[in-house]
Every structure is written in structure tokens, then in C-alpha cells.
């Protein structure tokens, strides 16, 4: 491997939506930073059976629904 081309790999703290924290290694951020998740396996509709409502970030979900609204009719 070439030296000095890979990003720094360090410990960060990941905070789940329910407040649970765990430490993992990542290239994201700096040593000791906290990554707060908006969606995780405990709240994502794909893993919860769709009981949670999806957040529409920047109108992407509504644009998708509008574009494909008549697809299965």
C-alpha cells in the first residue's frame, strides 16, 4: 500500500435515535467526535415493518411518490 494516501482511522461515538451510544472506528470526523443518527435499524421503516413514517428530506419522498403514483394502478 502507498503511504500517506489513506484517511485517518480513529474512534468515534455513534448515537442512535433512542440515545444509545457505542464507540466504533471510522474515517468520519475527528477522534472523539459524535455522530448523531436520524434513522437507524431501530427506527427505519425497512426494519420496523413500516410503522414509522419516513422523513421527507428536501422533498425527495414526495417527488418520488408524485412521479410513480400511478405505476401500480
From Swiss-Prot:
Which InterPro entries does this chain map to?
Ribosomal_bL28/bL31-like_sf, Ribosomal_bL31, Ribosomal_bL31_A, Ribosomal_bL31_sf
**One Pfam family for this entry, by name?**
Ribosomal_L31
Q: Which GO terms describe its biological process?
A: translation
Region Disordered, annotated ranges? 34-54
- Supply the SUPFAM superfamilies for this chain: L28p-like
The record's note on quaternary structure and interaction partners says: Part of the 50S ribosomal subunit.
Which HAMAP family does the entry link to? Ribosomal_bL31_1
What name does this protein carry?
Large ribosomal subunit protein bL31
Whichever gene encodes this chain, its name is rpmE
